[in-house]
Structure formats: structure tokens, C-alpha cells
From Swiss-Prot:
Activates macrophages and polarizes them into M1-like macrophages through the activation of the MAPK and NF-kappaB signaling pathway. Upon activation, up-regulates the expression of CD80, CD86, CD69 and MHC II on macrophages, and induces the release of pro-inflammatory cytokines such as TNF, IL1B, IL6, CCL2 and nitric oxide. May play a role in inhibition of proliferation and migration. It comes from Homo sapiens. The chain crosses the membrane at residues 95-115. Signal peptide: none annotated. GO terms for biological process: glycoprotein biosynthetic process; innate immune response; macrophage activation; positive regulation of canonical NF-kappaB signal transduction; positive regulation of interleukin-1 beta production; positive regulation of interleukin-6 production; positive regulation of MAPK cascade; positive regulation of MHC class II biosynthetic process. This is Transmembrane protein 106A.
Length: 262
């Protein structure tokens, strides 16, 4: 009888040992789990089953069951801390800084080179003149010069010239020409234009025709508008000048190009 009880006790101890050994270790850091409908197994650093240790939480994907559906097998996302060396945060900050710096430098250069600067129009004076008379009128044909200076870092195009010539506050000549004059960046060009005038004034006629008068000059007031275009933008430049023209004979006075202002 005593022998029977001792055998029964040893059998129960062996059974308890086998039952305890089949349980997973509470402090283990990895638990195998598999997807439903698949023979593949994965290893996770966070146990899927809840434990008494406060450092572990229940896996939100498998809800502690240790298995995930097969359709979610390729949708697992690994969360990596920002300070992880695999992200190389120092290099990331450097790349962001260099990108911002390059954008700022590029923008500054674009603004500097494309910022519109002044286009200067300066009348350079009379180049030549021819005169003719009839019984009461003076026909005076003059050729003048305009110096055009482009202060921009891109070319401009002069498209139109409109002007009028006045004598004693009366319009004696008009010009309206369509042009295609190209002026390069930081360059200057000379433009010639001709105006045919007709003066009908008795006193002016006497000044130009009487031989007793030694000085045969008439004062002409020239005012005009020059239209130029650049970067899909048109600009009108106003200029004016006063010219003393010899109305007794023909004249030719060449002028040099005015240098571009610094």
C-alpha cells in the first residue's frame, strides 16, 4: 500500500514538471508567431502575449494571440526611433541645411540678375541737316542721335520710337517708327533717326534767308518716347532735347558714343 502511494506521488511530480516546462518563459525577449494560413514563422522582439513585466505591452497587430492574418503579412511596419544610428540624423540635418542654403543662394542670384535696372536714353545731338526754301516755307530735314544704355544683366529690344519737333511751341515735324534694335546686357548702342520739318514763320524765314544776318540758327525742341521690351515687359522712356540748327546751309556734325555710366 505504501509502495503504491510513493509511485503515485512520483508520477504526479513528473507530470507537474512536464506541464511547467511546456510554458514559455515570462522573461523571454522573443516569441515565435505565425500567420494564419501560412507555414512561415517570424520572430518579434516584443512578445505577443501579455506578461507581468511592465516593460512589455500587448502586440497591437496580433492582439496577443501570437498569429496574424495572412493578408496583413506584408503590411507590418517597423517603428525606428529618431535617434537610431541607421537614420543618420546628423547627415540628415546636414543635407537639409545644404538644401536650404543652395535654395537661398540660387534665389539671391536669380533676384540679383533678373532685378530690373534702368535703361537710359540720352540725346546725343544733331548729326546732319539739310535745308531748302520756297517762297514762304523752310524745309529742314535733320538727323539726330540717341544713346541708349542698358543697365540690365539681360538683353532688351527697342520696339518703337515716337517723337515730335516743335518750333515756337508749334509742331513742325513728327515721327513714329517701329524698330527692332537689340541691345545686349550692360551694353550701349547709338540709334539714328531722321525728321522732316516744315517751318512757316515770317521772322524765321527772314533769319534763314537774309544775307545781312550772319547767324542763321533756329531753335528746335525735340520731345519723344522710346519703347523697349524685356522679360515680357514693355517700358516707355521719355526724352527731350533742344537743338540749334543752321538753316542757311547743309551741315554734318558726327558724334561719338557716350560711354555706359559705371
Amino acid at each position: 500500500m505504501g509502495k503504491t502511494f510513493s509511485q503515485l506521488g512520483s508520477w504526479r511530480e513528473d507530470e507537474n514538471k512536464s506541464i511547467l516546462s511546456s510554458k514559455p518563459a515570462i522573461g523571454s525577449k522573443a516569441v515565435n508567431y505565425s500567420s494564419t494560413g501560412s507555414s512561415k514563422s517570424f520572430c518579434s522582439c516584443v512578445p505577443c502575449e501579455g506578461t507581468a513585466d511592465a516593460s512589455f505591452v500587448t502586440c497591437p497587430t496580433c492582439q496577443g494571440s501570437g498569429k496574424i492574418p495572412q493578408e496583413l503579412e506584408k503590411q507590418l511596419v517597423a517603428l525606428i526611433p529618431y535617434g537610431d544610428q541607421r537614420l543618420k540624423p546628423k547627415h540628415t540635418k546636414l543635407f537639409v541645411f545644404l538644401a536650404v542654403l543652395i535654395c537661398l543662394v540660387t534665389s539671391s542670384f536669380i533676384v540679383f540678375f533678373l532685378f530690373p535696372r534702368s535703361v537710359i536714353v540720352q540725346p546725343a545731338g544733331l548729326n546732319s541737316s539739310t535745308v531748302a526754301f520756297d517762297e514762304a516755307d523752310i524745309y529742314l530735314n535733320i538727323t539726330n542721335i540717341l544713346n541708349i544704355s542698358n543697365g540690365n544683366y539681360y538683353p532688351i529690344m527697342v520696339t518703337q520710337l515716337t517723337l515730335e519737333v516743335l518750333h515756337l511751341s508749334l509742331v513742325v515735324g513728327q515721327v513714329s517708327n517701329n524698330l527692332l534694335l537689340h541691345i545686349g546686357p550692360l551694353a550701349s548702342e547709338q540709334m539714328f533717326y531722321a525728321v522732316a520739318t516744315k517751318i512757316r514763320d515770317e521772322n524765321t524765314y527772314k533769319i534763314c534767308t537774309w544775307l545781312e544776318i550772319k547767324v542763321h540758327h533756329v531753335l528746335l525742341h525735340i520731345q519723344g518716347t522710346l519703347t523697349c521690351s524685356y522679360l515680357s515687359h514693355s517700358e516707355q522712356l521719355v526724352f527731350q532735347s533742344y537743338e540749334y540748327v543752321d538753316c542757311r546751309g547743309n551741315a554734318s556734325v558726327p558724334h561719338q558714343l557716350t560711354p555706359h555710366p559705371p
